[in-house]
Regions:
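Intrinsically disordered, low-complexity regulatory segments enriched in Ser/Thr/Pro
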Residues: 55-81
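Intrinsically disordered, charged low-complexity linkers and terminal tails
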Residues: 1, 40-44, 63-69
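A conserved amphipathic terminal alpha-helix motif
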Residues: 78-107
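Terminal, regulation- and interaction-focused segments at domain boundaries
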Residues: 1-28
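Ser/Thr-rich, low-complexity intrinsically disordered terminal regions
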Residues: 25-56
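Beta-strand elements of well-folded, non-transmembrane domains
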Residues: 7-13, 51-53, 74-76
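Short, low-complexity, polar/charged sequence segments that are solvent-exposed and flexible
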Residues: 23-28, 65-68, 88-92
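Hydrophobic beta-strand residues in large extracellular and virion-surface proteins
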Residues: 5-7, 19, 57-59, 68-70, ...
Length: 107
């Protein structure tokens, strides 16, 4: 199952870059595992849960529209609620002033 979280942000700079470089990310149970490998498209990153939550969140920043597209991917019938909860908790705690809207869609 895949869930898409669309975050509309204001302000300058990449929200994806701010998330990946935030030293407090692990306090929310999230670990950045990959970002911008050579040969891959620019502006993407991946985070996993540091807790028992299964799955990963792929982050892609669209600078012109100020939109962060987050694809939550789980395997083997695991539900995404725990990792989504940790991620939304992190966004609202650390980047609330930049966030204009958060949309969550199931695919």
């Amino acid at each position: 199952m895949q869930t898409v979280i669309q975050v509309i942000a204001s302000g300058r700079g990449s929200l994806r870059e701010k998330i990946i470089s935030d030293p407090r990310l692990q306090k929310f149970g999230l670990i950045p595992t990959e970002h911008m490998r050579p040969g891959r498209s620019h502006g993407w990153a991946k985070i996993h849960s540091a807790r028992e939550a299964h799955g990963a969140i792929n982050l892609e920043w669209h600078g012109r529209s100020g939109t962060l597209i987050c694809r939550v991917v789980t395997k083997l019938g695991n539900k995404p609620n725990s990792i989504i909860g940790d991620f939304i908790d992190y966004l609202l705690a650390r980047h609330q002033s930049r966030i204009l809207a958060i949309h969550i869609m199931r695919r």
